[in-house]
Regions:
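C-terminal boundary of histidine-terminating zinc-finger modules
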Residues: 257-269
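Phosphate-binding loop that captures ATP/GTP phosphates
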Residues: 70-128, 134-136, 141-142
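Walker A/P-loop phosphate-binding motif and the immediately C-terminal alpha-helix
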Residues: 43-80
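C-terminal-of-GTPase-core extension/linker across diverse P-loop GTPases
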Residues: 267-290, 294-297
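Conserved catalytic-core segment of NTP-binding enzymes
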Residues: 143-146, 150-256
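Residue-level signature of catalytic and energy-coupling elements of molecular machines
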Residues: 41, 52, 78, 86, ...
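Extreme N-terminal, non-catalytic leader segments
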Residues: 2-51, 277, 281-284, 288-289
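Hydrophobic anchor at the start of a short beta-strand
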Residues: 7, 73-74, 204-205
Length: 297
């Protein structure tokens, strides 16, 4: 008989400044976040977007799988509490198990994951405000037996807000990848997420452009959402354009069916994600650990 799992949430009121102070690596006096320690090898990658609908979660999922295919130990936290989708995209149907009062995250395609999707019905909304969200994120970090993966990807909700503030405090050495589309309007909105990262001292490492083009059956390439948005954003932020991902039916189908396209390196889209993973792992190596103190202007 499986043990029933609950996600405990403590209610408290705090302003933004207090919330940031509370999250500096030692949330609520419960001990340090595992990935906060200076000698931990794990690279924490926040995957962000300015708006919904740009394919951020599918990029997170497939990047995680691609990093795993390169021989890395990879974990994903689905921090998009209101719009969780990582379990479906990875094809995970079993909930976490419980061993010694710790959650053991389920795994698929070489990627371990934790998500609100394991604790809430997929068709039911999660109606939470800041303090509840903050506590849940704390538990995702401290009450899960992560060990020490090479990469921890955190799928942030679109836009800016409490989730980003909490994660920035828990994990101030995180790196951020910003997902956008070629549309100028999407690029402008994504820019806000990047500027938010600067406010909380998170380093933006690169931009990933999704839905860059569509190749028709006749081999003609069509730029359905315009062109240049990803490059323009990368140039404005002074970071590289890490990769461009085409609009292909298999990407959507794989996300719906739990079969990430990055698992098949023989396909064009699989090879594209593999190259993005290589760039992230090799070309965007962290230079050094930065100071711990947050700068909120």
């Amino acid at each position: 008989m499986s043990k029933k799992m609950t996600l405990a949430v403590e209610f408290s009121l705090m302003n933004q400044e207090s919330q940031i102070e509370e999250t500096k690596g030692t949330p609520h006096g419960e001990g340090p976040v595992p990935f906060f320690e200076a000698n931990v090898k794990t690279r924490v990658l926040l995957v962000a977007s300015g708006k919904g609908g740009v394919g951020k979660s599918s990029v997170t999922t497939n990047l995680a799988v691609a990093l795993s295919k390169r021989g890395n130990d990879v974990a994903v936290i689905d921090a998009d509490v209101w719009g969780f989708s990582i379990p479906r995209m990875l094809g995970i149907t079993e909930p976490p198990s419980v061993v010694d009062d710790m959650l053991v995250p389920p795994s698929a395609h070489g990627v371990r994951s934790i998500s609100m999707g394991f604790f809430a019905d997929e068709d039911q909304p999660v109606i939470w405000r800041g303090p509840m969200l903050h506590k849940a994120l704390n538990q995702f970090l401290t009450d899960v037996a992560w060990d020490e993966p090479d990469f921890l990807l955190i799928d942030l909700p679109p836009g800016t807000g409490d989730t980003a503030i909490s994660i920035a405090g828990f994990l101030p050495d995180s790196e951020m990848l910003v997902v956008t589309t070629p549309q100028v309007a999407a690029q402008a909105v994504a820019q806000r997420a990047a500027f938010m990262a600067g406010k909380v001292d998170i380093e933006v490492r690169g931009v990933i452009e999704n839905m860059s083009w569509f190749t028709a059956d006749d081999g003609q390439r069509y730029e359905l959402f315009g062109a240049g948005g990803g490059k323009a954003l990368a140039d404005k932020l002074g970071v590289p354009l890490v990769g461009q991902i085409p609009l292909v039916p298999t990407l959507r189908e794989g996300s719906d069916n739990g079969n990430p396209v990055a698992a098949d390196l023989s396909t064009e889209i699989g090879a594209i994600f593999s190259e993005i993973a290589r760039v992230v792992e090799e070309d965007l190596k962290p230079s050094k650990r930065r100071h711990r103190e947050l700068k909120i202007n």
